[in-house]
From Swiss-Prot:
This is Parvalbumin beta 2. Ca(2+) 1 binds at residues 51, 53, 55, 57, 59, 62. It comes from Merluccius polli. One of its GO terms (molecular function) is calcium ion binding. The keyword Metal-binding applies. The modification N-acetylalanine is found at residue 1. Keywords: Acetylation, Allergen, Calcium, Metal-binding, Muscle protein, Repeat. Ca(2+) 2 binds at residues 90, 92, 94, 96, 101. Transmembrane segments: none annotated. In muscle, parvalbumin is thought to be involved in relaxation after contraction. It binds two calcium ions. Belongs to the parvalbumin family. It comes from the Eukaryota.
């Protein structure tokens, strides 16, 4: 799903670092997976991979399964992790993360 954008080894390392429930930190994950240093175009491409229902927004249910987009065997985020992730990215308070909010969140 992320071929040509992110390296498999970086994805594996980023997932390993947050295997335990409650240890997910979006800033650390974005940095480890190599997304932070990517071009605006690649960051947008990643958004559209994560936006599973193609609504143009990443909603709470998609955030909960965020890690599984990177690897099917990964865990779901806890409710607390999901809500913190959403709160960090949803700057306009509409309950979802749009593509522009995503770009800001990745570079935060």
């Amino acid at each position: 799903a992320f071929s040509g954008i992110l390296a498999e080894a970086d994805i594996a390392a980023a997932l390993k670092a947050c295997e335990a429930a409650g240890t997910f930190n979006y800033k650390a994950f974005f940095a480890k997976v190599g997304l932070t240093g990517k071009s605006a175009d690649d960051i947008k491409k990643a958004f559209f991979v994560i936006d599973q229902d193609k609504s143009g927004f990443i909603e709470e249910d998609e955030l909960k399964l965020f890690l599984q987009v990177f690897s099917a065997g990964a865990r779901a985020l806890t409710d607390a992790e999901t809500k913190a992730f959403l709160k960090a990215g949803d700057s306009d308070g509409d309950g979802a993360i749009g593509v522009d909010e995503w770009a800001v969140l990745v570079k935060a």
